[in-house]
């Protein structure tokens, strides 16, 4: 055997003997207390059911807390932004576009634009106000006979089906979809219809402004571009892409040309009012086009959820449940879906054909189906089928 290996083997035996000797010197009673303390410490955090999702949520808990605090404190700021931006578009439409419509459009088109624009504006204002002021619905805190599926770990109260806890509102919400910072309110059972209708009619209104004002936008953009060229020539900057971007000191030849242009153009071709008109048209078109794309995508997503009879939260829950059952060879079926058309009827509260007009296309403050605690709507409302 190699001498180094023999020395190493002897050293390991000595260390093992020392450890055994030290352990034997520790009283058994002390070792028992140490084991008990270790057990108590592990009981505070150890859970055999803990998975990667729980660990991820625990790590991101400070981020969630910060988002909740910011959303809670800036809720009124978001509401103010919605009101301010919408009011600015309405102001431009009334003082810039409406006079143009009255002087250039035929009587038929003029009546159509005025009627549609005001109808759309009324629907937007009504549904936004109702979505903001209507409580989403809360589970009863007193003991009742209503069946519940679980107990909220935050509120410590029975939680009915489709109810979830909102960390921003600090309470449980009936049929919670999400907390909307633009409403400064949760979207739940009693204001879900108002929220979706607001998104739908605001999207339609922005699309209407964007499409009907596209020619005005092109004219205004070209006019502003011409004004930039004229101002650049006056200052002696070459009328090129680089010259418009970089305000350099003009050369002698360019300076002479600038003096000549300044002498020829003694009066500005457009007044301040004309400039503000063109800038307002550009602002309105860019804003409404952007909102049309962003809010339109959100509206389509919520329309898909309504068709499936689920909320944004239930979409994730149902997806996980479907994957779990798929591994067992089973198909998951949403118990709260009554069919594509019936889901829309339940959502809008449509009971007869005339309700599509009075409850969907006109402002209506009717209550939704049910109380948000139980969901046996379809067996009790079979007369909805022929609508």
UniProtKB/Swiss-Prot annotation:
<dbReference type="GO" id="GO:0021537">
    <property type="term" value="P:telencephalon development"/>
</dbReference>
<dbReference type="GO" id="GO:0005789">
    <property type="term" value="C:endoplasmic reticulum membrane"/>
</dbReference>
<protein>
    <recommendedName>
        <fullName>Palmitoyltransferase ZDHHC16A</fullName>
        <ecNumber>2.3.1.225</ecNumber>
    </recommendedName>
</protein>
<keyword id="KW-0256">Endoplasmic reticulum</keyword>
<feature type="transmembrane region" description="Helical">
    <location>
        <begin position="198"/>
        <end position="218"/>
    </location>
</feature>
<dbReference type="GO" id="GO:0006974">
    <property type="term" value="P:DNA damage response"/>
</dbReference>
<dbReference type="GO" id="GO:0021899">
    <property type="term" value="P:fibroblast growth factor receptor signaling pathway involved in forebrain neuron fate commitment"/>
</dbReference>
<dbReference type="GO" id="GO:0021898">
    <property type="term" value="P:commitment of multipotent stem cells to neuronal lineage in forebrain"/>
</dbReference>
<dbReference type="InterPro" id="IPR039859">
    <property type="entry name" value="PFA4/ZDH16/20/ERF2-like"/>
</dbReference>
<feature type="transmembrane region" description="Helical">
    <location>
        <begin position="73"/>
        <end position="93"/>
    </location>
</feature>
<dbReference type="GO" id="GO:0019706">
    <property type="term" value="F:protein-cysteine S-palmitoyltransferase activity"/>
</dbReference>
<dbReference type="GO" id="GO:0018345">
    <property type="term" value="P:protein palmitoylation"/>
</dbReference>
<keyword id="KW-0808">Transferase</keyword>
<dbReference type="Pfam" id="PF01529">
    <property type="entry name" value="DHHC"/>
</dbReference>
<feature type="transmembrane region" description="Helical">
    <location>
        <begin position="236"/>
        <end position="256"/>
    </location>
</feature>
<dbReference type="GO" id="GO:0001654">
    <property type="term" value="P:eye development"/>
</dbReference>
<feature type="active site" description="S-palmitoyl cysteine intermediate">
    <location>
        <position position="180"/>
    </location>
</feature>
<keyword id="KW-0472">Membrane</keyword>
<comment type="similarity">
    <text>Belongs to the DHHC palmitoyltransferase family.</text>
</comment>
<dbReference type="GO" id="GO:0007507">
    <property type="term" value="P:heart development"/>
</dbReference>
<feature type="domain" description="DHHC">
    <location>
        <begin position="150"/>
        <end position="200"/>
    </location>
</feature>
<dbReference type="GO" id="GO:0005794">
    <property type="term" value="C:Golgi apparatus"/>
</dbReference>
<dbReference type="InterPro" id="IPR001594">
    <property type="entry name" value="Palmitoyltrfase_DHHC"/>
</dbReference>
<feature type="transmembrane region" description="Helical">
    <location>
        <begin position="281"/>
        <end position="301"/>
    </location>
</feature>
<keyword id="KW-0812">Transmembrane</keyword>
<dbReference type="GO" id="GO:0016409">
    <property type="term" value="F:palmitoyltransferase activity"/>
</dbReference>
<feature type="transmembrane region" description="Helical">
    <location>
        <begin position="106"/>
        <end position="126"/>
    </location>
</feature>
<keyword id="KW-0012">Acyltransferase</keyword>
<comment type="function">
    <text>Palmitoyl acyltransferase that mediates palmitoylation of proteins and is required during embryonic heart development. Involved in the proliferation of neural stem cells by regulating the FGF/ERK pathway. Involved in the proliferation of neural stem cells by regulating the FGF/ERK pathway.</text>
</comment>
<keyword id="KW-1133">Transmembrane helix</keyword>
């Amino acid at each position: 055997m190699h001498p180094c290996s023999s020395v190493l083997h002897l050293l390991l035996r000595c260390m093992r003997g020392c450890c055994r000797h030290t352990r034997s010197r520790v009283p058994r009673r002390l070792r028992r207390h140490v084991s008990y303390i270790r057990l108590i410490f592990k009981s505070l955090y150890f859970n055999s059911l803990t998975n990667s999702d729980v660990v991820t949520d625990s790590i991101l808990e400070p981020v969630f807390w910060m988002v909740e605090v910011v959303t809670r404190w800036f809720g009124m700021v978001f509401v103010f932004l919605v009101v301010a931006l919408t009011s600015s578009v309405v102001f431009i439409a009334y003082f810039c576009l409406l006079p143009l419509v009255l002087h250039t459009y035929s009587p038929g088109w003029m009546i159509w634009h005025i009627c549609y624009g005001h109808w759309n504006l009324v629907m937007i204002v009504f549904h936004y106000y109702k979505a903001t002021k209507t409580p989403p619905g809360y589970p009863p805190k007193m003991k009742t006979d209503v069946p519940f599926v679980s107990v909220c770990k935050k509120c410590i109260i029975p939680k009915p089906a489709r109810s979830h806890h909102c960390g921003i509102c600090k309470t449980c919400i009936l049929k919670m979809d999400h907390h909307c910072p633009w409403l400064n309110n949760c979207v739940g059972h009693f204001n879900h219809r108002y929220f979706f209708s607001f998104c739908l009619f605001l999207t339609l209104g922005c699309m209407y402004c964007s499409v009907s004002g596209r020619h005005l936008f092109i004219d205004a953009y070209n006019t502003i571009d011409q004004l930039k060229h004229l101002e650049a020539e006056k200052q002696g900057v070459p009328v090129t892409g680089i010259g418009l971007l970089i305000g350099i000191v003009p050369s002698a030849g360019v300076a002479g040309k600038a003096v000549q242009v300044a002498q020829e153009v003694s009066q500005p071709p457009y007044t301040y009012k004309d400039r503000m008109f063109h800038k307002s048209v550009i602002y309105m078109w860019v804003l409404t086009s952007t909102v049309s794309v962003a809010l339109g995508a959100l509206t389509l997503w919520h329309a898909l959820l309504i068709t499936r009879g689920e909320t944004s939260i239930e979409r994730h829950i149902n997806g996980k449940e479907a994957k779990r059952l798929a591994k067992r060879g089973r198909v998951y079926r949403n118990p709260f879906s009554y069919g594509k058309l019936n889901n829309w009827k339940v959502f809008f509260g449509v009971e007869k054909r005339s309700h599509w007009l009075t409850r969907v296309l006109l402002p209506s403050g009717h209550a939704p189906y049910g109380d948000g605690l139980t969901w046996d709507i379809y067996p009790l409302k079979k007369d909805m089928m022929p609508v």
